[in-house]
Amino acid sequence: MLRILLINSDKPEPIQFFQKDKETNDSINISVITRSCYAPLYSHWADHVYIVDDVTDLTVMKSLMLEILKVGPFDHIVSTTEKSILTGGFLRSYFGIAGPGFETALYMTNKLAMKTKLKMEGIPVADFLCVSQVEDIPAAGEKLGWPIIVKPALGSGALNTFIIHSLDHYEDLYSTSGGLGELKKNNSLMIAEKCIEMEEFHCDTLYADGEILFVSISKYTVPLLKGMAKIQGSFILSQNDPVYAEILELQKSVAQAFRITDGPGHLEIYRTHSGELIVGEIAMRIGGGGISRMIEKKFNISLWESSLNISVYRDPNLTVNPIEGTVGYFSLPCRNGTIKEFTPIEEWEKLAGILEVELLYQEGDVVDEKQSSSFDLARLYFCLENENEVQHLLALVKQTYYLHLTEDHMMNQ
């Protein structure tokens, strides 16, 4: 009997994968650790469901694991969400279970540890400082030079991430209710780094046994933070693009520094005006937003299926069959409130090059979400003859896009 522990929230891809696995394979025992609000997603198919208030609480998770192991040992621990990755690494290392360990997970989730290690290894990163309270931000700005980026050391999706342009800007944010999001009330580690002018790329990989099984390198239409709450996206670069080989070498250097051997990686890279490539961040997960579906449309593979197969040491079932052309996606931003109307889907579908329109909300939906890099109304997937056509299509999308609300809920704006 193969025993698997899944640590997850409501992330649908692992749920669908392991539920199907359970239904078709009698020799698998699947236990799940999740929050109580997500338990109904698992209770009808998982063998055991364990409830915790916070999967990031390592003390609680270790104690729970000791109880669970009385039933029998686990062969694999699967942790696919940003909040569960560090916990998964800790539990594997502490209990001697195969898979990515605590140190690798720490470097790929804690941005302060990440950038400190990269700097020690001689891999270029923007100048940064540790910040333990928001009142220390002015000193960080003076030392690094304004503008700076301030964000939690642990987190994803650009949640509670701020570009602060000057001391006056900081004081305005500090004195405004909600101006610094949850940074003021959270007693958690932060990182401040120099905000630089650049182009931004992302490199998405799958590793198994220390080898790269798959790589896709893409360019964002606008740097992520500057594109927040605006139409943005990315497109996959040709392997013949001069920057492709440079980014791939940088990816390999990071993987060696962090001892990445198995699973997915999502690396963000900056190219400065001088042409220097520096590492932004790397995550031990599949890229968010429309990235995985974009890659599926280009290469005819499922990053999720292959990644989850790797997590339980199976054949990744990875046969790459790329289509011709430049494939990418645009994210159309959503806003909090009750959705009255938005651009008819037919207006987007008739644009030349559009492959699919993915709607995340419908008219009449009441939306109350935190602002993040994946807070989207819709995503448009496209295939064009070459990347020179991307900006033209983006301009057409901007002309057609509108979103009208009947009321705004400001708490999470």
Swiss-Prot record:
Q: How does activity depend on pH?
A: Optimum pH is 9.5.
Q: Which superkingdom?
A: Bacteria
Which residues of the sequence carry a binding annotation for ATP?
141-202
Q: Where does Mn(2+) bind?
A: 268, 281
Q: How does activity depend on temperature?
A: Optimum temperature is 37 degrees Celsius.
**Where is Mg(2+) bound in this sequence?**
268, 281
Query: Which reaction is recorded as catalysed by this protein?
Result: an L-alpha-amino acid + L-arginine + ATP = L-arginyl-L-alpha-amino acid + ADP + phosphate + H(+)
Record keywords: ATP-binding, Cobalt, Ligase, Magnesium, Manganese, Metal-binding, Nucleotide-binding
EC number per UniProt:
6.3.2.48
| GO MF term list | ATP binding; ligase activity; metal ion binding
Q: How is the cofactor bound?
A: Activity is maximal in the presence of Mg(2+). The use of Mn(2+) or Co(2+) decreases ligase activity.
Claim: Membrane is one of the keywords in the record: no
What cofactor does this chain's UniProt record say it requires? Answer: Mg(2+); Mn(2+); Co(2+)
| Location of the ATP-grasp domain | 115-312
The stretch of residues making up the signal peptide is none
Task: Quote the function comment for this protein.
Answer: Catalyzes the synthesis of Arg-Xaa dipeptides in an ATP-dependent manner. Has strict specificity toward arginine as the N-terminal substrate.
Assembly: Homodimer.
Per its record, how is this protein called by name?
Answer: L-arginine-specific L-amino acid ligase
